[in-house]
Swiss-Prot record:
GO biological process: one example: chloroplast fission
InterPro entries (UniProt xref): LSM_dom_sf (IPR010920), MscS_beta-dom_sf (IPR023408), MscS_channel_2nd (IPR006685), Msl2-3_C (IPR056876), YnaI-like (IPR045042)
Annotated source species: Arabidopsis thaliana
One of the record's GO cellular component terms: chloroplast membrane
Gene: MSL3
Tissue-level expression: Widely expressed.
Name of the protein in question: Mechanosensitive ion channel protein 3, chloroplastic
Compartments where found: Plastid, Chloroplast membrane
Disruption phenotype: Msl2 and msl3 double mutant shows abnormalities in the size and shape of plastids with enlarged chloroplasts containing multiple FtsZ rings.
Keyword Hydrolase among record annotations: no
Length: 678
């Protein structure tokens, strides 16, 4: 190789000297190549020239004699500034480096062929996008636009042009390295295997990327042209994903085939592998097939409101994600994420509330039974309200307003209202329902009707004594509390002290009366005072009538002396016997004797109080009857005639009230006469 270097002087007045071929020849170290050197010094004025004059060298210097290609020469032109004279060695070393590089490239043709392949790969990897950005900035002045990454040009270059350039560079690289023969057979075999692998994977990846980008672009085009709420978008998504998956599966199969592996065995695997796949991956395979069914049939799509019941758990929410292998995600009403396996949707009922065409209004309005005369007009006006509402469906579906039934608990008149709102949105349905209910309540208020309220019956529980003494009207209708006199029971020690103070001290010849006799005498003394109090309270019973009653009581006592006398004597005998036995036992102990006397007195007092309580209840019965007869002025006449009269007349048909009343009165008279005779 011959290298020719030329140094060009510059003058201040821009006079350019043509430099011809030098007269001297300098042999190189090898003795083969000749380097022509011509040195021309610059004048003193040229040293003061501006550096800009150097840029005019090429345009003003004229033509330089070219070197023939047959000489295989490399021409290096340089402009040297005046200095210490070190320019020669630098220029010479540079020429030597270039000479060696050129000789190396010329001696090995495979390296020369690698340059375009490596250049294509480097350009596709690092130079394509900057070049596109530079062209966009130069032509459209939109280099800083944020949407440049999403432009169609960017998408085409990155999705189609870049994979093809990478594939071209890989193929050229493999073609260049294929003729190279390595010294060892093992290295040659490894080289061939690697080249086959590189060709296969580059081909599969390049065309798979282009095909997948094309499928995504087609899917995006069809989904953008349709309505976003259209359910066909889910079908396009399913088709795109299926073809996308199939493309990559085919690419993997092709890659295995290009490597020399047979994919038929993998695709038609059976026997033990199928059994293991069935047992281990049954749930995964079931979910995958169920997801295919969901995408194909589209029972629900994204952002739809569904309701289902899975394992006894109510699920209601918006569909957030429909997975292939992963579960479907439902965003609940409380904003919780519910993950449901896809195969659950194929075996359970799913309600899609978003796909509703109408929402139903169904309710009951209960009118009071007191407004039964207004029910016809109320129902008619309610029908008019629904027929005039434009948001209520009038033609396709029913519209019902009827008096459905009567509530057996409170006798309320229940009106059925059933209609459909022409909307699929739940919020709009609630607004229409609110307006309809307010209009129906306005109709009820316009007619002066009342809504029914619950009716409760409160009953008072009475004991047997109160049931015997209370009137029938008080028990069934009035349920009023009885104004009865309460009996005052004094303690036993006070009664004993009163008896001791009132009774005179017995003479030595007389015996002291027993406690039973004392109590009987006390009862006989208290009876006239009670009868006197009753006559004072009644105020209408004359003295002659009281005397006649006393005479009748005396006659009755003579007739019943044998029976009642015997009964009283028999009842008093055990008490007397017990008192005598206790006295005998307590002769030695005076304190014990006093305690025994007190206990005997208490026993006799309890018996007398029981008999007096029975007499008092009978007397209070008579007083309550008199009070009922005298208090008719306070109670209303309408209640007395309608409520009590009708109820008593109706009850006489089933209950023998008169007979029981007469029997109870006779029994009371006989008991009073018996007590008086005693």
């Amino acid at each position: 190789m011959m290298m020719r270097t030329v140094a060009l002087p510059l003058s201040h007045d821009l006079n350019v000297h043509k430099i011809h071929e030098a007269s001297g020849f300098h042999n190189s170290a090898a003795g083969k190549n000749r380097v022509y050197l011509t040195r021309t010094g610059l004048s003193s004025c040229a040293t003061r020239q501006d550096v800009w004059s150097l840029q005019l060298l090429e345009s003003l210097s004229g033509s330089i004699v070219p070197v023939s290609s047959r000489c295989n020469a490399f021409v290096c032109r340089s402009a040297l500034s005046p200095g210490n004279g070190n320019e020669g060695p630098i220029l010479k070393s540079t020429a030597v480096i270039f000479t060696r590089v050129y000789d190396a490239l010329g001696g090995n043709p495979h390296l020369v062929k690698l340059i375009p392949a490596v250049g294509i790969l480097a350009f596709a990897t690092w130079g394509l996008r900057p070049l596109l950005r530079l062209a966009r900035t130069t032509l459209f002045e939109k280099g800083n636009d944020a949407n440049s990454q999403k432009s169609s040009t960017q998408y085409i270059v990155v999705s189609y042009l870049q994979p093809l350039l990478l594939w071209s560079g890989a193929i050229l690289l493999c073609r260049t390295l294929d003729p190279i023969v390595l010294p060892s057979s093992a290295g040659q075999a490894i080289k061939q295997r690697l080249l086959i692998f590189a060709r296969s994977i580059s081909t599969v990846l390049a065309f798979s990327c282009c095909l997948s980008s094309l499928l995504q672009q087609v899917q995006k085009f069809f989904m953008e042209t349709n309505n976003p709420a259209d359910t066909r978008n889910m079908g396009f998504s399913f088709a795109g994903k299926a073809v996308y998956t199939a493309a990559w599966v085919a690419a993997a199969s092709l890659f295995m085939e290009l490597l020399g592996f047979s994919t038929q065995k993998w695709l038609t695997a059976g026997g033990l592998g199928t059994v293991l796949l069935t047992l281990a991956g049954r749930e995964i395979l079931t979910n995958f097939l169920s997801s295919i069914m969901i995408h194909a049939t589209r029972p629900f799509v994204l952002n739809e409101w569904i309701q289902t019941k899975i394992g006894g758990y109510e699920v209601s929410g918006t569909v957030e994600q429909v997975g292939w292998w992963s579960p479907t995600i439902i965003r609940g009403d409380d904003r919780e994420a519910v993950h449901i396996p896809n195969h659950q949707f194929s075996v359970n009922i799913v309600r899609n509330l978003t796909q509703k065409t109408h929402w139903r209004i169904k309710t009951h309005l209960a009118i009071s039974h007191l407004d039964v005369s207004k029910i016809n007009n109320i129902v008619a006006d309610m029908r008019k309200v629904l027929s005039k509402n434009p948001q209520i469906e009038q033609q396709k579906i029913h519209r019902r307003v009827f008096l459905e039934d009567i509530d057996p608990e409170n006798q309320a008149l229940r009106i059925l209202i059933s209609c459909f709102v022409k909307t699929s949105r739940f919020e709009e349905y609630l607004c229409v329902k609110e307006a309809v209910l307010l209009d129906l309540l306005t109709v009820i208020r316009h007619h002066g009707a009342r809504l029914a309220t619950p009716i409760r019956t409160v009953q008072r529980m009475r004991n047997e004594a109160e049931v015997d003494t209370a009137g029938f009207s008080d028990i069934v209708f009035n349920q009023a509390a009885m104004n009865r006199r309460y009996m005052l029971i004094e303690p036993s020690y006070k009664i004993n002290s009163d008896d001791n103070s009132k009774s005179p001290s017995p003479s030595p010849g007389q015996k002291s009366p027993s406690p039973g006799q004392k109590s009987e005498e006390r009862d006989l003394q208290e009876e006239p005072s009670e009868t006197k109090a009753e006559t004072e309270n009644n105020g209408s019973v004359p003295v002659s009538n009281a005397k006649k009653e006393n005479q009748k009581a005396a006659l009755g006592s003579n007739s019943n002396t044998g029976t009642k006398g015997s009964s009283t004597s028999t009842s008093d005998q055990p008490v007397a016997q017990k008192s005598e036995e206790k006295k005998k036992e307590s002769v030695g102990d005076p304190h014990k004797a006093e305690k025994d006397e007190v206990s005997d007195d208490e026993a006799t007092i309890e018996q007398t109080l029981k008999s007096k309580a029975k007499q008092g209840s009978e007397k209070n019965n008579g007083e309550s009857k008199a009070r009922d007869g005298g208090g008719s002025g306070t109670s209303s006449l309408l209640e007395e005639n309608l409520v009590l009269g009708v109820a008593l007349d109706g009850s006489k048909r089933t209950l023998p009230i008169d007979e029981e009343h007469k029997a109870s009165g006779a029994l009371m008279d006989s008991e009073e006469l018996g007590i008086g005779s005693e």
